[in-house]
């Protein structure tokens, strides 16, 4: 597999890999009476090295609607959503969550969501490091992400209990979360636990 296909600084190395693969595979082909299928491109390679697609390609993360290069050219296919479980008014200077990590600097409306790190919501997203979307507006996480619940600030958002919340999806790309976590989208996706209900749609 072309290991540096997602980074332009490795293009010379990648082209060298492709040339070596082509030479070796042609040598093998001469030893077989039938055509052998050749493939070397991963998701990034499909986008950046179309001339190296040979007979097949290995669409990995691209299959899940994530591009290693440019998300504008691929449709999102995976969304993680939850709903607002409860909304409470919390006074200024009070705290939210375990270890009293969520310090409030104003009178706030705090919403509880029934999703936590046991579902795959990374704890490093808490304490204002990230946000989710409520009715299309950014709602930052307040305090620590708990095992089964997390809290968000909806003070400036028109919302009610039962409203949908997008953790990642069409309007909040998973790459936003992976960038905040300094990881890759694969890790975010594979961290979603089995207890999270999956719903599949067919177009």
Which residue ranges define each predicted feature?
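C-terminal accessory subdomain/extension
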Residues: 89-203
């Amino acid at each position: 597999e072309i290991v540096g296909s997602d980074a332009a600084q490795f293009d010379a190395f990648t082209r060298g890999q492709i040339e070596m693969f082509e030479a070796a595979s042609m040598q093998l082909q001469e030893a077989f009476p039938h055509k052998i299928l050749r493939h070397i491109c991963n998701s990034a390679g499909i986008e950046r090295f179309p001339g190296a697609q040979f007979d097949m390609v290995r669409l990995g993360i691209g299959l899940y609607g994530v591009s290693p290069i440019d998300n504008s050219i691929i449709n999102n296919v995976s969304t993680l959503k939850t709903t607002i479980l409860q909304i409470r008014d919390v006074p200024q200077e009070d705290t939210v969550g375990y270890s009293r990590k969520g310090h409030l600097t104003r009178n706030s409306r705090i919403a509880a969501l029934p999703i936590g790190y046991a579902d795959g919501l990374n704890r490093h997203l808490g304490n204002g490091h990230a946000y989710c979307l409520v009715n299309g507006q950014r709602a930052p996480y307040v305090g620590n992400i708990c095992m089964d619940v997390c809290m968000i600030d909806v003070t400036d958002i028109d919302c009610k209990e039962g409203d949908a919340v997008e953790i990642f999806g069409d309007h909040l790309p998973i790459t936003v979360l992976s960038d905040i976590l300094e990881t890759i989208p694969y890790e975010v996706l594979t961290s979603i636990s089995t207890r999270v209900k999956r719903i599949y749609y067919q177009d």
